[in-house]
Regions:
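Glycine-rich anion-binding loop/nest that anchors nucleotide
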Residues: 47, 232-234, 325
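Aspartyl protease catalytic domain
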Residues: 155-157, 161-217
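Structural alpha-helical scaffold elements that stabilize or flank donor/cofactor-binding regions
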Residues: 35-36, 222
């Protein structure tokens, strides 16, 4: 019997992997509802898109149980389109409607971020001790149709950082702080690394001017020192990331593999595939059919039936895992995002098994990536 690769647990860290196409099913819908039901005193929920009935019902139970201890913030619309035309994670605007339908509107705050940027987080903080995060939205698509990974982490220190970030998004000036960092300003610093058992976890956030490009800078630095890279990404279009990948991994001998979403890659590519103004040679990997594969996903539909390859995942040197809400695109730098950089051979092995399942499935039954 093949080993069950859908769930990994080590001490206070639990990882739930999901892909219906690759037959990896950790039942994240149930685990998310159980996480919410486990709240005894307080629950903070920051979510880009919420439509899943089981999750909404669990939040309704939490409202009855916790009263003022429940607070939800959600993305309330993208606002005007950005001049670049580059977007991320399209969605129908139903979250607010459903929150009201389930009687949760008095516990919820709509977040409007100016300039077409997104409140793109997907995390919960429970009782100041536990964090739920990952790549998946709380939707039918995010929990049952897409490729996603979710984490439940017990750590008071990590919970404090996420709670502070949550409160920052409620600040009246939050929506207007998403602008490029002053180049003369001090470089952003990551939050302190926390240990969960033997796993070192460093959280990164993009929540405004003080942390602008914090996550991107850390990811590029990690790639610059890596010799082996595995990427599972909805899209791959950040200039800094693309440049280091071209410089260090475009050689046929380089140890790199990737799983991407063909439809969403068009959002970040230059003509004829897309409308980006980035140099075509940065997308060398879309022609590398041996090392990069595309998921047989479909383009966005207004209903909650989107089946994107939705991970935002990198595994480096069998030691480091990068995952969270942060797409590897330029747009992510000015969204509200969170990502984790974890150092642990055991965690990296679990994520590699998941990656390999996706890669093998899409190598056989995938969809070609767009080329330029």
């Amino acid at each position: 019997m093949a080993p069950n690769i859908s769930i990994f647990q080590a001490g206070g860290l639990r990882v739930y992997f999901y892909s219906h196409r690759a037959n990896v099913n950790s039942n994240p819908t149930k685990h998310l509802a159980d996480f919410i039901d486990g709240a005894k005193k307080a629950l903070l929920c920051a979510i880009y898109d919420i439509q899943d009935q089981s999750t909404l019902q669990a939040l309704k139970r939490a409202a009855t149980r916790l009263s003022t201890g429940l607070h939800i913030i959600y993305d309330a619309g993208k606002g005007p389109a950005r001049k670049t035309g580059v977007t991320a994670d399209p969605k129908p605007s139903k979250s607010g409607q459903l929150i009201k339908q389930y009687g949760l509107d008095s516990y919820a705050t709509a977040v409007h971020v100016q300039g077409g940027n997104l409140m793109h987080d997907k995390f919960l903080v429970r009782d100041a001790v536990d964090v739920w995060t990952g790549s998946g939205n709380f939707t039918k698509g995010g929990l049952t149709l897409q490729d996603n990974n979710f984490l439940a982490i017990t750590s008071a220190a990590l919970s404090q950082v996420y709670a502070d970030t949550f409160r920052g998004m409620l600040h009246p000036a939050h929506g207007s702080t998403h602008s490029p960092k002053n180049p003369k300003g001090a470089p952003p610093k990551p939050h302190a690394t926390v240990k969960v058992g033997a796993v070192k976890i460093t959280p990164y956030f993009t929540t405004g001017v003080n942390e602008f490009e914090d996550a991107e800078t850390a990811i590029v630095k990690a790639l610059q020192g890596a010799k082996k890279v595995r990427i599972a990404a909805m899209n791959l279009g950040d200039p800094g990331i693309l440049q280091v990948l071209k410089q260090r991994f475009s050689s046929p001998q380089a140890d790199i593999r990737g799983v991407l979403d063909p439809g969403q890659m068009r959002q970040v590519m230059p003509p004829p595939a897309g409308r980006s103004k980035q140099p075509a040679d940065l997308f060398w990997f879309t022609k590398d059919h041996n090392r990069f594969v595309g998921a047989p996903s479909h383009t966005f539909v207004p209903s909650d039936n989107n089946d994107f390859m939705h991970n935002k995942l990198m595994i480096l040197d069998d030691q480091i895992v990068i995952t969270g809400s942060y797409n590897f695109s330029e747009h992510a730098e000015v969204n509200d995002e969170n990502t984790l950089i974890m150092q642990s051979p055991a965690v990296a092995k679990a994520y590699t098994q998941y990656f390999d399942a996706l890669f093998e499935q899409y190598k056989k039954n995938g969809k070609p990536l767009p080329i330029v």
